[in-house]
Regions:
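Nucleotide-sugar donor-binding catalytic core of glycosyltransferases
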Residues: 3, 11-14, 18-20, 133-288
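Extended catalytic core of nucleotide-activated donor transferases of GT-like folds
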Residues: 6, 10, 17-127, 144-150, ...
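Conserved catalytic or regulatory cores that recognize and/or transform ribose-phosphate-containing ligands
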Residues: 130
Length: 288
């Protein structure tokens, strides 16, 4: 039987991660473990999740730390604290690892990485096998609804189709490439062609699209240069995501189904001209 352990979790600006922290806290406590959630938004000292209460909790060492997307384990201060306590640090990447090269190169000593995509696991093994000795796949699943809350039949539900996520126009995301490379330069053209390739074939990963484009250009680069180019591909990753997101939403809007959009930026979406497209205003508290 596992001995009682002391866990550290985090609150941040990302609601989905905060929801996961609450779920983990509940499960850990049910199993008899101690849990402290540190609010990185730096609330007042009297707040139960403040840095003051964190310091008091750390008077006795923590056994394990659970992070999402490196939040709570990539900062120098936290690396020093976790190494001093000998804590096992579990980092769960919900987003592509190409966004977290620096975290995978510098992290606490007892660092265990999990990815929610098998291709992401292979990416880490391929490019960061030396600095990240342990990486594994963790399925991304939902949670069982409370038994106390009745299941609402589909005919009685408030929304036909609800999309939650931030809206950006994809061309606004591509601007980041212009900020890194002069328009018309060889590097700019390479990323431009890479994006076109992703539009034509949605099955491609960012890595495969870059490798194919390098072959098209006849370029041979070192592994370190390739890693740098992959890191710079974050802008392309965002651009193709927003392009495909808008494509899907346009299709739903034109289908005539009642579509509800929740998130930042949707007031700038051109499809709101459709009478069947509705914006859910405000912020929805995940705890409700």
């Amino acid at each position: 039987m596992m001995k009682d352990m002391r866990f550290i979790l985090f609150y941040s600006e990302i609601d989905s991660f905060n929801f996961a922290a609450d779920e983990l806290e509940r499960e850990f406590r049910l199993r008899g473990h101690e849990v402290f959630i540190l609010d990185l938004k730096n609330p007042p000292e009297e707040d139960p999740h403040s840095y003051l209460h964190f310091t008091q909790f750390m008077a006795h060492k923590a056994d394990a730390v659970v992070c999402f997307d490196g939040i709570g384990c990539r900062e120098d201060l936290f690396i020093e604290i976790w190494d001093a306590s000998g804590a096992v640090v579990i980092d769960i990447l919900m987003d592509p690892p190409l966004r977290f090269h620096s975290t995978m190169e510098k992290h606490p000593a007892n660092y265990f990485l999990f990815c929610c995509d098998l291709e992401h696991v292979e990416y880490v093994k391929k490019y960061f096998g030396q600095s990240v000795p342990y990486v594994a796949f963790m399925p991304h699943v939902g949670v069982m609804p409370s038994q106390e809350r009745p299941v609402i039949p589909y005919t009685g539900r408030k929304y036909d189709v609800l999309f939650t996520g931030t809206y950006y126009h994809y061309q606004d995301r591509f601007v980041q490439i212009r900020q890194m490379f002069a328009e018309g330069s060889d590097m700019y053209r390479l990323y431009e062609c890479m994006f076109d390739r992703l539009v034509c074939d949605s099955s491609l990963t960012i890595e495969k699209a870059l490798l194919d484009t390098l072959e098209q250009f006849g370029w041979s680069v070192s592994e370190e240069m390739l890693k740098t180019m992959l890191r710079c591909s974050e802008a392309i990753d965002w651009t193709i995501r927003t392009y495909q997101r808008e494509t899907v939403i346009n299709t739903l809007a034109e289908s005539g189904m009642e579509l509800y959009l929740l998130g930042k930026g949707w007031k700038d979406y051109s499809g709101i001209r459709h009478s069947n497209v509705h914006i859910v205003d405000g912020w929805v508290d995940y705890r409700r």
